[in-house]
A protein has these predicted regions:
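Rhodanese-like catalytic fold shared by cysteine-dependent sulfurtransferases
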Residues: 1-9, 15-45, 51-101, 178
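Short, well-ordered beta-to-alpha junction loops that form the rim of enzyme active sites
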Residues: 14, 231-235, 342
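A structural preference for short, hydrophobic beta-strand core positions in alpha/beta folds
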Residues: 29, 72, 161, 189-191, ...
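Catalytic subdomain that performs nucleotidyl-dependent activation
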Residues: 158-159, 229, 237-318, 322
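An accessory alpha-helical subdomain
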Residues: 318-345
Length: 357
C-alpha cells in the first residue's frame, strides 16, 4: 500500500526520468504501464497526472471503472507548472543563486565547472561564446556559471546567451523567459520552425530535432560573430552515453568536452558542465526554488512522449537504472566508466577506427 496523507493522492504516471526532473510537491511516481499492478488506496481521491493531461485522462477513466475515486489533472504537470509560475512575482534571485554557487555548492558545482574549463581548455582569451539555453536546469545553470566566470575572468572573452524558439507555445516560452529574468541572464531569442518540420516524422523525431537544433544554433552563433557554442551536457550524460554506445550501438565512444564542427568552419562546441554531477544540479535548482520544463516541444504538448514505448527515454532510463544497480556493488563504477575512455589500450583491442575510417 502506498503511504499517503490527506484525502487526495497525486499519482504522476510519467517515466521516472521525467518525474525526477520536476514534479508536483507530494506526488508519487507510478509509470502508466505499472498503474494497474499497483496497490492503490480506495479510501483516497486519486488525482492522475501526466505531462499534459491526455494520457492521464484515459488512465483515470480506467481506474474509475475499477471502482477508484480517480480524476484527471487537466493540463497535466506542465499545466500545473505554468499556472503556478504565472501567479508568482518575477523576483530577481540572481544574487542568491550566485551566492549558493559560491558557498553552498562551491565544491560540487563551481570547482568542477572551473576544473572542466581549465583541464580541457574550453575557454580561451578573446573567445566569443554563444551559450545555448534550452530552458532546462542544465543550460540555465551553465549560463549562470559562465556569466560569473566572465565577470571575474583574468582574460577577456565575450558571451552571448542564446535561446532558440523552435516553435514553443507562448506559455512555454514565457516560462523560459521568466526563469532567465529571475536569474539575471540577458537572453537573445531567435525563432525557427523545427518543431513543425519534425512533428510528422515517425522514426526518431527527437534525434532529428536535436540535430536540426544544433545546426540552427551553430548558424546563429556564427552570424553573431561567435567561434564557440556551449551546451549544458553534464557528467552523468557522459557516462550514460558511453554505456549506450556500447550496449545499443556496438561501439566505444564518448561525449567529448569539446568538438570542432565539421559543417561550420572555425566553430567549436564546448561542454563546461562536463564534470558536474546531475544530482548536484538538481540540489542547486531545488535550493533556489527554481522549476524548469524538461522539453517544451509539440510532442510534450500532446503527451506523445508520455507513452511507455518512448525509445530514447526508455533507453536512457535503462542505463541510469543499470548504473544505479552497479553502484550498489561498486561505488566507484561511475568514475570508472568516465575514466575508461581515457585508458584505452590500442594494442589490446581487435580493431579501431580513426577519422579516416
Amino acid at each position: 500500500m502506498i503511504n499517503t496523507s490527506g484525502n487526495t493522492l497525486i499519482i504522476d504516471i510519467r517515466d521516472e526520468l521525467s518525474f525526477e526532473y520536476g514534479h508536483i510537491d507530494g506526488a508519487v511516481n507510478i509509470p502508466a504501464e505499472k498503474l494497474d499492478k499497483s496497490d492503490l488506496p480506495k479510501d483516497k481521491k486519486l488525482l492522475i497526472c501526466c505531462k499534459s493531461g491526455l494520457i492521464s485522462d484515459t488512465e483515470a477513466e480506467k481506474l474509475r471503472e475499477l471502482g477508484y475515486d480517480a480524476e484527471n489533472l487537466e493540463g497535466g504537470y506542465y499545466g500545473w507548472l505554468r499556472e503556478k509560475l504565472s501567479k508568482e512575482v518575477v523576483e530577481d534571485i540572481s544574487q542568491d543563486a550566485e551566492r549558493s554557487i559560491q558557498k553552498k555548492f562551491r565544491k560540487e558545482i563551481w570547482n568542477r565547472f572551473t576544473q572542466s574549463v581549465n583541464e580541457y581548455e574550453l575557454i580561451k582569451p578573446n573567445d566569443r561564446i554563444a551559450v545555448c539555453i534550452s530552458g532546462g536546469k542544465d543550460s540555465m545553470l551553465m549560463a549562470k556559471l559562465i556569466q560569473m566566470l566572465h565577470r571575474h575572468s583574468k582574460f577577456p572573452f565575450e558571451v552571448k546567451y542564446l535561446v532558440m524558439d523552435p516553435g514553443y507555445s507562448p506559455a512555454n516560452r514565457e516560462i523560459i523567459e521568466r526563469n532567465a529574468k529571475r536569474l539575471g541572464i540577458p537572453i537573445t531569442v531567435f525563432e525557427s520552425d523545427i518543431f513543425d518540420s519534425v512533428y510528422n516524422v515517425e522514426k526518431n523525431p527527437c534525434y532529428l530535432c536535436a540535430r536540426m537544433r544544433r545546426g540552427h544554433l551553430y548558424s546563429k552563433a556564427q552570424e553573431l560573430g561567435c567561434n564557440k557554442i556551449a551546451l549544458g551536457h553534464h557528467y552523468d550524460d557522459v557516462i550514460e552515453t558511453i554505456l549506450m554506445s556500447m550496449l545499443y550501438g556496438g561501439q566505444i565512444q564518448t561525449m567529448m568536452p569539446k568538438l570542432n564542427s565539421t559543417n561550420f568552419k572555425g566553430m567549436q562546441l564546448i561542454r563546461p558542465l562536463y564534470m558536474v554531477r546531475e544530482d548536484d544540479i538538481k540540489r542547486w535548482r531545488d535550493y533556489n526554488g527554481l522549476r524548469f520544463i524538461q522539453c517544451a516541444c509539440k510532442f510534450t504538448d500532446t503527451c506523445t512522449t508520455c507513452a511507455p514505448d518512448s525509445r530514447t527515454v526508455s533507453k536512457r532510463m535503462e542505463i541510469k537504472q543499470l548504473i544505479a544497480k552497479l553502484k550498489l556493488v561498486n561505488p566507484q563504477v561511475e568514475y570508472n566508466i568516465f575514466k575508461s575512455v581515457e585508458n584505452v589500450m590500442l594494442n589490446q583491442v581487435i580493431a579501431y577506427k580513426d577519422d579516416e575510417g
